[in-house]
């Protein structure tokens, strides 16, 4: 399933891009999003010469799941790693999301880009999610549920970002 999500932020593109690789933003602001724990920064490598940051974030789901999903996964084992390489110069990134416990359950990858959108900026995510279900016709339903949850959380990220910026300015 292909998906596209666009977010609007009240900050210039450089500030937004820098926040997305700032450990305090990841821990404090991302932890305010519904149904997931604050991500744990497993690794972060800055390549000054290339102008990139590669980071691995471990997430855990802590919300309610639709019954169609709980038939196949245990909510307490629903954890995943988001491996992202951010190009700070072009304000673009490539990401891959890999389940920790259900390694063959789904594959998700994509890109995002940040561009100016007065009075702030916008981030556009383009991705692809494939659920490998042993039951015919269920994979598509699970894909829709996962993308719907992702969209819901990402719609709330600009408010978490604004809160984080306000906390930094105190």
Q: How would you label these PLM feature ranges?
A:
Residues 1-65:
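Hydrophobic ligand-binding cavity/cleft-lining segments
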Residues 9-11, 88-90, 118-120:
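A generic beta-sheet turn/junction motif
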Residues 12, 17, 76, 149-153:
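Short amphipathic alpha-helical segments
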Residues 16-20, 125, 161:
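Hydrophobic pocket/interface hotspot
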Residues 28-37, 71-77, 101-106:
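Short, solvent-exposed secondary-structure boundary motifs
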Residues 40-97:
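Glycine-rich portal/gate segments that line the openings of hydrophobic small-molecule binding cavities
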Residues 53-55, 80, 85, 94-148:
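Beta-strand/loop substructures that line and gate deep hydrophobic ligand-binding cavities in soluble
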Residues 81, 85-88, 139-170:
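A conserved amphipathic terminal alpha-helix motif
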């Amino acid at each position: 399933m292909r998906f596209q999500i666009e977010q609007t932020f009240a900050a210039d593109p450089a500030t937004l891009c820098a926040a997305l690789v700032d450990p305090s933003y990841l821990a404090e602001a991302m932890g305010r999003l519904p149904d997931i724990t604050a991500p744990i920064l497993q690794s972060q490598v800055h390549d000054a010469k290339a102008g990139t940051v590669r980071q691995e974030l471990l997430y855990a789901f802590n919300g309610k799941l639709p019954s169609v999903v709980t038939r196949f996964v245990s909510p307490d084992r629903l954890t995943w790693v988001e491996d992202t390489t951010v190009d700070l110069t072009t304000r673009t990134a490539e990401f891959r999301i890999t389940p920790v416990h259900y390694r063959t359950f789904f594959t998700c990858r994509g890109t995002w880009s940040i561009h100016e959108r007065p009075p702030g900026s916008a981030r556009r995510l383009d991705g692809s999610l494939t659920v490998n279900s042993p039951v015919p016709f269920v994979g598509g339903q699970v894909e829709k549920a996962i993308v719907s949850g992702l969209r819901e959380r990402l719609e709330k990220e600009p408010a978490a970002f604004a809160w984080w910026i306000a906390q930094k300015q105190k």
